[in-house]
């Protein structure tokens, strides 16, 4: 909760700097895959922590940031989404639901048609991150698809974070950004 408040205050504090810019970008990339496992064993505190980090913080930050950058002609928000937002996976009910919330937020914000604001919820694909290591270490009884993720790692099929970052920035700073509310970086 403290980090969320700091993020919102930081967005509000940046108003002076943003007013001098012609283009500003907000990337909501925080994500927590835990709790993993079926309901009944997830724990209320873990569920609430995931919802706070994966949904409440990005939405509150986006709201504060849009207000703080009102005078900037080109504002762009990208929510880093996941295939889990669009496909249900056993053991990931909380993660799927929270990522789907970001997709729906982007769709609804596009309908708001705020002047100078573009938004997308963008799934990057499977990237070689600490989250992936955590997923691969999960017991199959909690996440039946763990073998698929272990295989992607074993076969060298994970994308590097730097490659994904370059492709993501190329797209986010490009003219086509915001044409669709929900996209997959691999299809761009």
What are these regions (language model features)?
Residues 17, 22, 31-48, 91:
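Conserved mid-core segment of classical short-chain dehydrogenase/reductases
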Residues 82:
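Residue(s) in the substrate-gating loop at a strand-loop-helix junction
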Residues 87, 108-117:
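Active-site-adjacent segment of SDR/Rossmann-fold oxidoreductases
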Residues 27, 78, 119-122, 132:
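Hydrophobic structural elements of the Rossmann-like NAD(P)H-binding subdomain
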Residues 62, 98:
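Active-site helix of classical SDR
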Residues 1-5:
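Rossmann-fold cofactor-recognition segment
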Residues 121-124, 129, 137-188:
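C-terminal helical subdomain
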């Amino acid at each position: 909760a403290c980090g969320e408040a700091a993020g919102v205050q930081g967005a509000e504090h940046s108003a002076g700097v943003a007013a001098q810019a012609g283009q500003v970008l907000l990337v909501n990339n925080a994500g927590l895959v835990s709790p993993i496992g079926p309901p009944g064993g997830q724990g209320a505190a873990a569920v609430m922590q995931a919802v706070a980090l994966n949904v409440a913080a990005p939405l509150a930050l986006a709201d504060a940031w849009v207000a703080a950058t009102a005078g900037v002609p080109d504002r762009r928000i990208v929510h880093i989404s996941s295939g889990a937002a669009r496909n249900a996976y056993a053991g990931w009910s909380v993660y799927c639901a929270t990522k789907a919330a970001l997709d729906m937020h982007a769709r609804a914000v596009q309908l708001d048609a705020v002047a100078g604001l573009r938004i997308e919820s963008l799934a990057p694909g499977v990237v070689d991150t600490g989250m992936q290591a955590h997923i691969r270490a999960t017991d199959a009884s909690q996440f039946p698809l763990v073998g698929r993720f272990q295989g992607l790692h074993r076969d060298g099929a994970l994308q590097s974070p730097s490659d994904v970052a370059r492709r993501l920035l190329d797209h986010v700073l490009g003219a086509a950004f915001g044409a669709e509310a929900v996209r997959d970086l691999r299809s761009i």
